[in-house]
């Protein structure tokens, strides 16, 4: 990027569509759910239910070593089943979305973004959705996008990334 003189790039992900499930009793599902290019009245698409991360080799946030620890991560919890600290998950301890803040604003427990609480390392994340049930032979469609933008400094690139994401969301919708 230095030879292109476009600044520090930013990358982001957006969860466009989750699996299709039946609507709950009394829930307005007049819009219906999307699946494989078809609208399904009386159904809904699940939204992302949690976002968790782990760090390869970190003593606190290390990789899951069995299915129970992996399942905790899929629920937006740490591998031992405890909640993430509020520096990561925000002031609401029921928050299941790590780093949901706006990186263009100051980091705080009201705006958690990936700060300097642990050194740089092999970081991984999970965009989770559920629960839902699938029988053998069932099909589901989950759609997400991965975006890249570069526009000046790091924060300018994040602002541009948000514009790119908004355009992609509009195109998908």
Spans of features found by a protein language model:
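Extracellular/surface-associated beta-sandwich interaction domains
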Residues: 1-173
């Amino acid at each position: 990027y230095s030879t292109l003189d476009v600044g520090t790039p930013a990358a982001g992900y957006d969860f466009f569509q989750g699996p299709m499930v039946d609507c709950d009793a009394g829930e307005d599902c007049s819009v219906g759910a999307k699946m494989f290019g078809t609208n399904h009245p009386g159904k809904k698409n699940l939204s992302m239910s949690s976002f968790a991360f782990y760090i390869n080799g970190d003593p606190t946030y290390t990789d899951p070593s069995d299915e129970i620890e992996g399942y905790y991560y899929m629920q937006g919890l740490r591998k031992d089943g405890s909640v993430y600290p509020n520096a990561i998950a925000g002031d609401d301890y029921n928050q299941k979305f790590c780093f949901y803040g706006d990186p263009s604003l100051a980091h705080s427990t009201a705006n958690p973004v990936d700060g300097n609480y642990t050194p740089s390392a092999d970081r991984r994340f999970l965009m989770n959705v559920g629960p839902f049930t699938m029988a053998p032979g069932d099909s589901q469609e989950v759609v997400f996008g991965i975006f890249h933008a570069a526009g000046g400094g790091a924060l300018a690139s994040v602002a541009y990334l948000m514009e790119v994401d908004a355009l992609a969301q509009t195109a998908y919708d």
